[in-house]
Design a protein with these regions (language model features):
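A short, charged, Gly/Pro-tolerant segment at domain boundaries
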Residues: 344, 348, 357-369
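Extreme N-terminal, non-catalytic leader segments
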Residues: 35-38, 45, 52-113, 357
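Conserved catalytic-core segment of NTP-binding enzymes
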Residues: 217-218, 224-325
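Phosphate-binding/switch loop-helix module in NTP-utilizing enzymes
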Residues: 187-234
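N-proximal, solvent-exposed amphipathic alpha-helical segments enriched in charged/polar residues
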Residues: 2-40
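Walker A/P-loop phosphate-binding motif and the immediately C-terminal alpha-helix
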Residues: 109-143, 261
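Phosphate-binding loop that captures ATP/GTP phosphates
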Residues: 132, 136-195, 201-202, 208
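C-terminal boundary of histidine-terminating zinc-finger modules
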Residues: 325-336
């Protein structure tokens, strides 16, 4: 065997690729890709290097960065004329709060919460869910805001009504690729839900447990705003894997965001991090950026409570217009800078969920090479 053919042997190729991947650093990686055992397959065919990764959390946006940073080096050391990259996902199922049993078909539940209303929690939740789906996951969203359900309107599905195939369970409403359910599908817009906390909590638990969810990697839970009895009850009884707290940079919002973090800590729900919504206002005429609600608030809050600042979302008229039309930005403007930010947020949320959690043995395994 000559030196050139030996360099292209399966063992040598895999070692070259693994060595290059080990040097790739990214905010979503606590350990490198080689340690993560993400390298699934390496092959050589017709002067083309074929590389396949299998990740336990959604990673598409970071994968694009990987290709940009590593392709030139791999072409140089292998002598390949081209690289065929492939990314697959085998999403991990992570242990839930107090090892509670999960919802049938649902691997992980991500609660999106805020200490107060009006900070953009629901808009963040719906775009996060769509971004997770765009990154390659199977995703659902449950509108847990019993008193102010807005997810049906944001998804353009407000006129749909759920069906019951067996007279007991509800089939989810499919919208933009998401499996969804909401009290908003069951009541009219002008019908106020005048329920006490225990009744509202019971209704939500029924919606969660009696919906015929398809197999989902992530179920996003749009929590009611606040930190009162209903929020505490939900946090204690729903099989949540991790929570995201949404706030604005404004001091008054940050005060209530602190309460949300403390609430989740008390019920032992891992806080994945903080999303700073309306971080800056972007003028639709000139593009000027202005931090109308202040700066640095969420970053300081994350430092104080030893958690992550997962993302900073801007305030722009197009984001509001897209939601009002029932086609959120991730769907209506897939190539926009705003969608790119949401997809990066999805990667970071999914990665943080994985690194903070513990994989349930037997529910996920990497495919053998």
């Amino acid at each position: 065997m000559n030196e050139q053919s030996q360099a292209k042997s399966p063992e040598a190729l895999r070692a070259m690729v693994a060595g290059t991947l080990a040097n790739f650093q990214h905010p979503t990686l606590k350990h490198n890709l080689t340690t993560l055992k993400a390298l699934h397959h390496v092959a050589w065919m017709d002067d083309t290097l074929h590389v396949e990764l299998v990740m336990p959390f959604v990673w598409h946006s970071a994968f694009e960065e990987l290709k940009e940073q590593c392709s030139a080096e791999l072409l140089r050391i292998t002598g390949a004329k081209a690289i065929d990259w492939k990314l697959s996902h085998n999403i991990a199922t992570l242990k839930r709060v107090k090892n509670q049993p999960g919802i049938n078909g649902v691997k992980n539940i991500i609660a999106v919460s805020s200490g107060k209303g009006g900070v953009g929690k629901s808009s963040t939740a719906v775009n996060l869910a769509l971004a997770l789906a765009a990154e390659g996951a199977k995703v659902g969203i449950l509108d847990a805001d019993i008193y102010g359900p807005s997810i049906p309107t944001m998804l353009g599905a407000e006129n749909q009504r759920p069906t019951s195939p067996d007279g007991t369970h509800m089939a989810p409403i499919m919208s933009h690729g998401l499996a969804t359910n909401s009290i908003g599908y069951l009541v009219t817009d002008d019908n106020a839900m005048v329920w006490r906390g225990p009744m509202a909590s019971k209704a939500l638990m029924q919606m969660l447990q009696e919906t015929l969810w398809p197999d989902l990697d992530y179920l996003v839970l749009d929590m009611p705003p606040g930190t009162g009895d209903i929020q505490l009850t939900l946090a204690q009884n729903i099989q949540v894997t991790g929570a995201v707290v949404v706030t604005t940079p404004q001091d008054i919002a940050l005060i209530d965001a602190k309460k949300g973090i403390v609430m989740f800590e008390k019920v032992e729900v891992p806080v994945l991090g903080i999303v700073e919504n309306m971080s800056v206002h972007i003028c639709s005429n000139c593009g000027h950026h202005e931090p109308i609600f202040g700066t640095g608030g969420a970053e300081k809050l994350a430092e104080k409570y030893h958690t992550q600042l997962l993302g900073q979302m801007p305030l722009h008229i197009s984001l509001r217009e897209d939601l009002d039309k029932g086609t959120p930005t991730v769907i209506s403007r897939p190539e926009s800078e705003f969608t790119a930010i949401y997809r990066q947020l999805a990667d970071r949320v999914a990665a943080q969920l994985y690194w903070q959690g513990e994989v349930i043995p037997g529910e996920i395994s990497f495919r053998a090479v």
